[in-house]
């Protein structure tokens, strides 16, 4: 059974991540049988969520947020043994990582 985790920073981009969460879930439902969604509440949450997902055998971890959320999620995947595929939807203010990688800055287009 294929499983993915979506980590959402609900305050990223002035709350924009919440608006795009259902779009991402719908898109990923065509690729994964099980989708789990977790919302961050503070520093370190994304790291903990991503690490736990990798340790539990999830196939992929996606995050919606800014550069801080991306950084925490990648660190969690690293701590979990790099066993998960990673993806992200830029919903932050600056989004340096997505700009460097050429990912569309419009969340709908990135999805």
Question: What are the roles of these predicted feature ranges?
Answer:
Residues 60-68, 72:
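Glycine-rich N-terminal segment of FAD-binding domains in flavoprotein oxidoreductases
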Residues 10, 64-66, 89-91:
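Glycine-rich beta-strand-to-loop/alpha-helix junction loops that act as flexible
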Residues 1-61, 75-76:
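ATP/NTP phosphate-donor binding region
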């Amino acid at each position: 059974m294929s499983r993915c985790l979506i980590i959402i920073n609900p305050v990223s981009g002035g709350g924009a991540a919440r608006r795009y969460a259902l779009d991402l879930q719908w898109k990923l439902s065509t690729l994964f049988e099980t989708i789990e969604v977790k919302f961050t509440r503070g520093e370190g949450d994304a790291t903990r969520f991503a690490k736990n997902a990798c340790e539990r055998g999830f196939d992929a971890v996606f995050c919606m947020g800014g550069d801080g959320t991306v950084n925490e999620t990648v660190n969690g995947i690293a701590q979990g043994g790099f066993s998960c595929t990673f993806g992200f939807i830029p919903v932050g203010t600056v989004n340096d990582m997505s700009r460097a990688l050429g990912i569309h800055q419009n969340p709908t287009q990135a999805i």
